[in-house]
C-alpha cells in the first residue's frame, strides 16, 4: 500500500543554512510550519553557505532532481551580487536552474533579493562596492529574476519591497551585519509562507511506499 507525502527540497545559500541564527534558517521555519499543517512532510535541505547561482547549478541541482521533489524553494543571488557576477551571467544560471527544477514536475518557489544596500555590511564594503552600485546591481538582478520567473512559470517571493522596512530594523541582522538573525529568518519565512502554500496546493501527488 502507499500513502501520499510531501517532499520539500530547498536549494540556496547561507540563508537556508541559518548562518547567524538557528540551523536551517528560513527553510527550517518553513519546514516546521509545514509539519504542523500537513502529514508526511519530508525535507531535503541542500543549501550551502557561500553558494552562488553557479555553484547551486553545479552542486545542488542534480541532487535535487534525483529526489523527485514536489515543492522546491530556491534562494540565491546575494553572493553573486557581492562577487561581481554580471546580471547576464546570473540570469543565464538562473534560467538553467529553473529549467532543471521545472523538469522534475515540482512547483518551484524563488525569492528575489532584498535591498542589501541597507545592510550594515554594505557601508563597510563601500570602498570596493559603492552603495549606488549595490542598488544598481540589485535592480538588475531582480529584473533578471522576474524574467526567469515569468519564462518558467515559477512562483515568486518578494523580499525586496518589505526589506526597506525590515532591514533597517535593529534586530533583522546578526552581529556580523550581513547574515540575518533568528528574527530576520522568521521574517523571511513569513514572506515565503503564503507562496509555499500555493505551491503545495498545486504540487504533484507522488505515492510513498509504506509497510
Model-inferred region functions:
Residues 23-25, 52, 135, 158:
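A short linear-motif detector with a strong N-terminal bias
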Residues 14, 20, 49-52, 79, ...:
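Gly/Ser/Thr-rich beta-alpha loop segments that engage phosphate groups in nucleotides
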Residues 58-211:
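Alpha-helical cap/lid subdomain in secreted, periplasmic
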Residues 1-50, 59-68:
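Serine-esterase "nucleophile elbow" of acetyl-processing enzymes
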Residues 55:
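Active-site-proximal substrate-binding core of FAD-dependent oxidoreductases
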Amino acid at each position: 500500500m502507499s500513502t501520499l507525502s510531501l517532499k520539500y527540497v530547498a536549494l540556496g545559500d547561507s540563508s537556508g543554512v541559518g548562518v547567524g541564527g538557528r540551523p536551517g534558517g528560513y527553510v527550517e521555519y518553513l519546514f516546521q510550519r509545514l509539519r504542523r499543517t500537513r502529514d508526511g512532510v519530508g525535507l531535503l535541505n541542500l543549501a550551502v553557505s557561500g553558494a552562488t547561482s553557479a555553484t547551486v547549478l553545479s552542486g545542488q541541482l542534480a541532487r535535487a532532481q534525483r529526489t523527485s521533489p514536489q515543492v522546491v524553494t530556491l534562494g540565491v543571488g546575494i553572493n553573486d551580487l557581492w562577487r561581481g557576477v554580471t546580471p547576464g551571467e546570473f540570469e543565464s544560471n538562473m534560467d538553467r536552474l529553473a529549467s532543471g527544477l521545472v523538469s522534475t514536475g515540482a512547483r518551484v518557489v524563488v525569492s528575489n533579493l532584498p535591498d542589501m544596500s541597507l545592510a550594515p555590511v554594505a557601508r563597510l564594503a563601500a570602498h570596493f562596492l559603492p552603495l549606488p552600485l549595490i542598488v544598481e546591481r540589485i535592480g538588475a538582478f531582480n529584473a533578471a529574476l522576474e524574467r526567469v520567473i515569468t519564462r518558467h512559470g515559477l512562483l515568486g517571493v518578494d523580499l525586496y519591497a518589505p526589506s526597506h522596512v525590515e532591514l533597517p530594523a535593529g534586530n533583522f541582522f546578526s552581529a556580523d551585519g550581513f547574515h540575518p538573525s533568528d528574527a530576520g529568518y522568521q521574517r523571511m519565512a513569513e514572506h515565503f509562507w503564503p507562496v509555499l502554500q500555493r505551491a503545495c496546493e498545486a504540487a504533484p501527488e507522488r505515492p510513498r511506499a509504506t509497510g
